[in-house]
A protein has these predicted regions:
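Residue-level signature of mid-helix packing/kink "hotspots" within the transmembrane helices
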Residues: 61-69, 153-154, 257-258, 262, ...
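C-terminal ends and interior cores of transmembrane alpha-helices
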Residues: 89-102, 283-295
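Cytoplasmic helix-loop-helix junction between adjacent transmembrane helices
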Residues: 112-148
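Paired small-residue
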Residues: 105-113, 287, 298-306
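Conserved MFS/SLC helix-loop-helix module at the cytosolic interface between two early adjacent transmembrane helices
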Residues: 66-101, 268-271
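C-terminal membrane-cytosol helix-exit motif in multi-pass small-molecule transporters
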Residues: 176-195, 379-384
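Helix-breaking motifs and short loop linkers at transmembrane-helix boundaries and internal kinks
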Residues: 47, 79, 100-105, 272, ...
């Protein structure tokens, strides 16, 4: 038995969408600052290795791997709104906690907690963005959400580099302020769960959930690994090839991802999710390959733009595909499981690819994800031949 909770998607106006956009952009501007500040802090202040840098950066995603399925299930039971608000307060406290992290293990611990609470907020945002969108516009809704994310990523790393140059404490303080602002904005967001599932209502097993999202999830895992390598190793990569600050490369990546998200969601809604994801993975892998072989200071810029374009096409399309296979009352749980595949790719990238880069050379930090993206491309091709599955 279930009880009605709120009105259908049509009842949520543009104001709800705008408040969500502002909260997401503010939160991810803070996370973008950390993308450049944390690797420099571990490398320059704490003397960490490339593997340590990768671990400190991507442990964020390891925590998310465990958190998202639980959060998704809870959102289907008690609602979305609590998961849009209180995690932002905790993130503000954890940002200040970075100032007290004077060893690599302490940074890793803070990043682990940031991953748990940050992924809680993001999972809620992803579910809410599809709650308030008509079914035929789901990819566009996910693309708009990720557009707000990349507004933060476009400027955050540049700001992080700027602030870190003036003192390692300034990035953490700026992040705390941004998280608190996002918390204030989130108070304006309504509950969007249409029908609460009660404790005695049947729910799909984890095996059935994994069967539904396995192939799109594996394809997204391959993209997630490459994305994590971009954010984890770009500060050291830019210095190794003689560019100095990574801010310009981060900005190029984020701007290319922003640009493609303006229309990738609409293309996926119109022509099909797989039709956008397949070429996206190809371009994504090619960009990593070019970064791995770049011998000039100009080639990394078009190469990293290709990775941004590829990821910007892949993520909204595959996310919408997962949502499309889920009944409304189980959307949170399905999205939680799907996003965990992305988190798994993110989590293994830092320590595994970082160790390879330490042993074989920094260029393998992008050579490995190029190979993995090729595998993801093959998996995505298989989605064209597989029939749609759903939990219903």
């Amino acid at each position: 038995m279930s009880a009605p909770a709120v009105a259908p998607a049509a009842a949520f106006g543009a104001t709800t969408r705008r408040w969500l956009d502002v909260a997401v952009a503010s939160n991810f501007l803070a996370i973008g600052i950390l993308l450049s500040a944390v690797p420099r802090y571990v490398k320059e202040e704490l003397g960490g290795s490339s593997a340590a840098v990768g671990t400190a950066t991507t442990i964020f995603f390891a925590a998310a791997l465990l958190t998202r399925p639980l959060v998704g299930r809870a959102m289907d039971r008690i609602g979305r709104r609590p998961f849009l608000t209180w995690p932002l307060l905790v993130m503000a406290v954890l940002a200040i906690g970075m100032e007290a992290a004077h060893a690599v293990w302490a940074v890793v611990l803070v990043r682990l907690l940031q991953g748990a609470f940050g992924s809680t907020f993001y999972t809620a945002c992803a579910v809410v963005s599809t709650d308030i969108a008509p079914p035929e516009q789901r990819a566009s809704a996910v693309a708009r959400l990720s557009l707000m994310i990349y507004l933060g990523f476009a400027f955050g790393p540049f700001i992080g580099e700027f602030l870190f140059d003036r003192g390692s404490q300034w990035p953490w303080l700026a992040c705390a302020v941004l998280h608190l602002f996002a918390f204030a904005v989130s108070q304006r967001l309504p509950e969007t769960l249409r029908e609460r599932r009660t404790a005695d209502q049947s729910r799909p097993s984890m095996r059935s959930l994994q069967r539904v999202v396995l192939r799109p999830g594996v394809a997204q895992l391959c993209a997630g690994l490459g994305y994590s390598c971009v954010v984890a190793f770009l500060p050291s990569y830019s210095r190794e090839i003689g560019l100095g600050s990574s801010g310009a490369l981060f900005f190029t990546y984020a701007c290319s991802a922003l640009l493609v998200r303006v229309f990738s969601g609409r293309l996926a809604d119109r022509f099909g999710y797989v039709a956008v994801a397949v070429p996206g993975l190809f371009v994504f892998g090619l960009g990593h390959f070019l970064m791995a072989i770049a011998r000039t200071e100009w080639l990394p810029f078009p190469a990293i733009a290709m990775t941004g374009i590829g990821f910007g096409a892949v993520f909204p399309a595959l996310t919408a595909l997962a949502v499309d296979r889920a009944p409304d009352e189980q959307r949170g749980q399905v999205l939680g499981v799907f996003l965990s595949f992305n988190d798994l790719g993110n989590a293994i990238a830092g320590p595994a690819v970082g160790a390879i880069a330490d042993a074989a050379g920094f260029r393998w930090g992008y050579g490995v994800p190029a190979i993995v993206a090729a595998f993801g491309f093959v998996v995505a091709l298989g989605l064209r031949r597989s029939p749609d599955r759903s939990l219903t």
